[in-house]
Amino acid sequence: DPYDEGRFGELTDVYKNDLHMSWVGMYGFNDTFGIVVRREVADRYGLRSYSDLARVSSQLSFGAEYDFFERADGYRAFCDAYGMSFANTIDLDIGLKYQALAEGQMDVMVVFTTDGQLSAADATILTDDRGFFPSYLCGNVVRDQVLEEHPELRAVLTKLNGTITDGDMAQMNYEVESEGRPPEDVAREYLQEKGLLS
C-alpha cells in the first residue's frame, strides 16, 4: 500500500497516550528517498513525476547504492509500484554518485531529499505521485513532563513549524559538507534570515 501521510496523527497519539511524549516543532522538511533525473533527460521527456518516468524507464539507466537494490522496500518494490523496467542498473558508491550522474553514467538516481550535493546537481527531482516512499518528517519529540516544567519550550519549538523546506535543508547540508562551513554558523544564519534569531 502507498504511504498515507494521514496516519501521522495515529503516531502522535501513541506517543502522547502511551509514551507521554509530544511532537512539537515540525520543521517542514522530509528526509526521505527521492528520484532525480539528469535535467537534460527530464526536459527531453517532460518528466515531472514518477509516473512520467515509468513511461520512458525502458530507455533509461538507473543508479543507486548497493543496499537500495537489496532492500525489500527498495528497487524491485519501487519498480513494481510504478510499472517500471529500466534498460540497466548501476551500483554506485555513495560518495561518487553525484559525479557519476553529472558525467552521464546513468540517467536516473535514488537520493535522499536533503542531500547536500543535490543543491548543486544539474538534476530534476521528480514527484512521488503515488506516495511510494514513506515520509521521514523532521520534528522534536519532547517528554510531556519537560513541557510541563518548561511551558515556554512549546512556544519556542512551535515557531519552527514549517520553517525549513527540503531544498533549504539540502542547501544547508551542502554548505557544511561541500564548503566546510561550521554547522552552527549555517544554522545561525538561517534562523536569522527567518527572523527566529537576532
Task: State the predicted function of each range.
Residues 8-62, 162-166:
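A conserved helix-loop-strand patch within extracytoplasmic ligand-binding domains
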Residues 1-24, 103-105, 117-131:
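Ligand-binding "clamshell"
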Residues 79-84, 152-198:
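An extracytoplasmic/periplasmic, membrane-proximal ligand-sensing/linker region
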Residues 32-43, 137-150:
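A bilobed periplasmic-binding-protein/Venus flytrap-type ligand-binding module shared by bacterial periplasmic
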Residues 58-61, 79-92:
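A local structural motif
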Residues 26-34, 128-137:
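Short Pro/Gly-enriched coil loops immediately N-terminal to beta-strands
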Residues 57-61, 96, 100-111:
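Alpha-to-beta junction loops
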Residues 66, 87-99:
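Short helix-initiation/N-cap motifs at beta->coil->alpha
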